[in-house]
Amino acid sequence: RPGPPETVDFPTANIPLPVVDFNFMLPEAPELAVCHSPRKDITEAFTPRDKSQIAIKDPKLFDENNTEIIDLSLIPAGEYAFPLPNGNVISPYGRRRRHHSGVDIKTCANDTIVSAFDGIVRMAKPFAAYGNVIVVRHYNGLETIYSHNSKNLVKPGDRVLAGQPIALTGRTGRATTEHLHFETRINGVHFNPNIVFNMAKRNYVQNVWLYPER
């Protein structure tokens, strides 16, 4: 099946992400309580295409079910880090002149960008409007994207921990100032990072939610 389109600006029709209260689902489907884990069986060996495209599906993520349970409620605080610890959001996710597929976080030039969760680097290279970009595939089923970097500090296949430096802020690609363009994706499809992260408090939202295969 073809993957999602490779652009920074996605049409609004692609953005809805159903957020389901797991406790609400539990009485109707009690088997869900024992069939999920915050750690997923993810694909860790990458093809040349995996290393060169942003929107890539993980063949293991939906290999048994067409709905995936994403559980962030059991992740310890030490296994999460705000990607730009000293930064502030200057442009939110959603509709502006075009649809914005992530959030822009501003700080000084060459500030340290860190991995949000433990994971493995899938892509690290210059890519179109993203400039120098890094994609990290996480064991919780998510991927995070870090772009416009002045310098990438990791390469595909590197295993990274939450809080580990992976890049320096810059303005490579289509950018008017030094900042981090940060995205969250599932199976190649971007969604609002505020579902996962509290940008004002610089921490993550300990939700459990369902995501249907696209």
Where in the sequence are the language-model features?
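Polar/charged, compositionally biased leader and regulatory segments
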Residues: 1-92, 204-214
